[in-house]
Design a protein with these regions (language model features):
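A short, small-residue-rich loop immediately preceding and capping a beta-strand
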Residues: 2-4, 53-60
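Acidic, glycine-rich active-site loops and adjacent beta-strand->loop/helix elements
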Residues: 7, 32-36, 89-92
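General beta-strand structural signal in soluble alpha/beta enzymes
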Residues: 1-2, 30, 114-117
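Conserved long hydrophobic alpha-helices within structured protein cores
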Residues: 6-12, 79
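Short, glycine/charge-rich flexible loops or terminal/linker lids adjacent to PRPP-binding catalytic cores
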Residues: 11-56, 66-70
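PRPP-dependent phosphoribosyltransferase catalytic core
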Residues: 73-124
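Short glycine-rich phosphate-binding loop at a beta-alpha junction
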Residues: 1-7, 86
Length: 124
């Protein structure tokens, strides 16, 4: 799993921790918004898997999908396969009559499946 810092950091860490407790280690990667200005100057931090590995991107709240797509692009550029984004809450901005929001449209255009645990209207 991977996520764009800072919002996804606790999600990535939580998935990694729970998977380790269940003896099914899932490594977590953090994708930076900008590369560090010192040290490795890397976009992606964490135990890097082999190129070609499938990675799911995690998001806390998704609105337009822009942050998630930025993370996906960096991961794909690094040689990983990303087909899915999982969000805790989908705000469903600019929702159409079919219940699809702006983020869902952006995900489809980037060949991504968007899965969310909650839609904002379910929480209000």
């Amino acid at each position: 799993v991977a996520g764009l810092t800072l919002g996804a950091d606790p999600l990535v860490a939580g998935v990694s921790l729970v998977s380790a407790l269940d003896s099914r280690m899932v490594n977590g990667l953090i994708v930076r918004k900008e590369p560090k200005g010192h040290g490795t100057q890397a976009w992606i931090e964490g135990p890097l898997p082999e190129k070609g590995t499938k990675i799911t991107v995690l998001e806390d709240v998704i609105t337009t999908g822009g942050s998630a797509i930025k993370a996906v692009e960096k991961l794909r550029d690094a040689g990983y396969i990303v087909n899915r984004v999982v969000a805790i809450v989908d705000r469903q901005d600019d929702c159409d009559s079919c219940g699809k929001g702006e983020a869902d449209t952006a995900m489809r255009e980037s060949d991504l499946e968007l899965c969310s645990i909650f839609k904002l209207n379910e929480l209000t």
